[in-house]
Amino acid sequence: NLFKQKQEGYYAVYVRVPNGNISSDVSRQLIAQLEGVIADDVRVTINQGLQFRFIKPESLPYVYSVLDAAGLAAPGFGSVADITSCPGTDTCNLGISNSTGTALALSEVIEEEFPEFLFNKDITVRISGCMNSCGQHGMASVGFHGSSLKAKGQVVPALQVLVGGAVLGSGDARISDKVIKVPSKRAPAVLTTIFNDYKTSAAAEESFTDYSFRKGEKYYYELLKPLANLETLSDDEFMDWGQEVKFSTAIGVGECAGVMIDLVSTLILEAEEKILAAEDCFSNEQWADSIYNAYAAQ
């Protein structure tokens, strides 16, 4: 999680934040303890972590002790165990599946069953609660996005599995292939199957990116097909991760998607409120806030 900056005599530290969740109390505590030790600004990374910059070598042990006390000194930033996930049904109006619960379950699988992958930065796992790519599932080595299936007259929480995405460098990238849809509770089995296959079948020194590209979408479909069998569903698989009631889909607004309302009219109302806020900020010469609200209204 540490690297030497191009500015002579300084280091930067990446902080792995599980699910990107950090409380305001912990944030304030970190800033208070690290003031004068790190740069005045803290950067948020695309994979939901933090970056502290301009740290002198003699201050590194102190920075580590502060992070360790806050439970944020775990290694493996940017590795396969550092799973990126959108909030999903925890807070999002459009979420279909509980992506944060899935992320925690998959992190446990990696840490317990594949410790040799903990520092592997060639493989990425990313999860979105719906088909929109807020969790960046379309550019993941192994991606998941929320969906649903019907079985035995009931709705089953499901995940669309994608394989083979990668950032190749020099402006090149590869979009992952949609492979198969499985019940959400089988996501750990999907990851275990894919990783065990890679361990046993890849050529020496062959990266997962190269291996998955060589094997292709049809290969992974056949590999994962047994996990899509809905005839073997257990009662637990009708409930999403972190839930104790049977899964159902709904459209709503606010922090809870359980209240059924007209989403379109509500979004228009919210846009009108943003426009009024932008006009108010503009009249008070709060230029940045005015621009923000005007942009949000669109």
Task: Report each predicted region and the residues it spans.
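Peripheral terminal and linker regions in Fe-S/redox and tRNA-modifying enzymes
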Residues: N1-E279
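Amphipathic alpha-helix face/heptad-repeat signature
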Residues: L267, N293-A294
